[in-house]
Design a protein with these regions (language model features):
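…primarily DNA-binding HTH/wHTH and HhH modules…
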Residues: 216-219, 243-262
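HTH DNA-binding helix-turn interface
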Residues: 192-201, 234, 244-251
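Alpha-helical bundle regulatory/interaction domains
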Residues: 1-160, 166-170, 175-176, 182-186, ...
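Short, function-defining helix-loop hinge/capping sites that tune catalysis or transport
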Residues: 98, 241-244
Length: 262
């Protein structure tokens, strides 16, 4: 997937982190796209003859769906040519869009076409009638506005601030230090995180810490995996390897070798 330079509309900027696109014209191809924990849910619109399947569940996905937090290693499996656009959301955004317990979205996808209080099919029809990325993003943006207006979930500034602090610190911040910055008790923080993100603060911090380490793996500024582990805040190499494997199903060295052989 490649990130696309795109100016997000001002009213949706608090909800959208970035936009990704990808396409493959090989009708005989077989593509598997690993999805690792990164702390961000998103909306995907996909076009393919044979469908997208979520592995290991082997679940056929809707043409227009919202995916939640990724905790276990999962992947998208696609046979033939395909094209998709992803609106990557901030961690709390799925709560504002769907008004449901975000925990039910963990390691899963929500079929937006099943919504019965908005005519989502109208948006899907508009999406399939254009190949222009700008137009597709505009259509999905209009759908997001309709969902936000419908649910009218109260914004939680303190949780949004806590998320921002955790991300800025690459997950390397103690919960007590975080509480001091947002003036909240640990119990209240955990309850609000579960309500708005579907994760505990510690789970979310661990995911951001892992994502920081996987980004460092692709850089050439480190001499060893041990250096990456320490710089990412892991207590020792075994801690780093254990955490990395829990999110990817692979050791860091295997992941790196596989990456270089692509």
């Amino acid at each position: 997937m490649k990130e696309t330079a795109f100016i997000i509309d001002r009213d949706l900027a608090p909800y959208v982190n970035c936009i990704y696109t990808d396409e493959n014209f090989d009708v005989n191809g077989h593509t598997n796209i690993p999805l690792y924990a990164d702390g961000y849910p998103g909306i995907m619109f996909q076009q393919t003859e044979n469908g997208f399947f979520l592995l290991p569940k082997n679940k056929k996905l809707s043409q227009l769906f919202l995916f939640g937090q990724t905790l276990e290693p999962v992947s998208l499996d696609i046979k033939g040519a395909y094209k998709f656009v992803v609106i990557q959301l901030y961690p709390f955004a799925s709560k504002y869009l769907l008004g449901i317990d975000p925990k039910v979205l963990n390691d899963d996808c929500y079929d937006l076409l099943e919504i019965n209080y908005i005519n989502v099919e109208k948006y899907r029809q508009s999406l399939i009638q254009t190949n222009n990325l700008d137009t597709q993003v505009k259509i999905i943006s209009d759908l997001m506005r309709a969902l936000i207006r419908t649910h009218k979930i109260s914004e939680n500034d303190k949780i949004e601030k806590a998320i921002s602090i955790i991300i800025q610190n690459n997950g390397q911040i103690k919960i007590k230090e975080l509480l001091d910055k947002i003036y909240m008790t640990e119990r209240t923080l955990e309850r609000n995180f579960m309500a708005y993100i579907g994760l505990t603060p510690k789970q979310f911090s661990k995911i951001i810490q892992f994502q920081s380490s996987i980004n460092k793996l692709t850089q050439s500024t480190y001499n060893s995996l041990l250096d990456i582990g320490y710089d990412s805040g892991f207590s020792d190499q075994s801690h780093f390897i254990r955490t990395f494997k829990s999110y990817t199903g692979q050791t860091p060295s295997y992941y790196l070798n596989h990456l270089s052989n692509r």
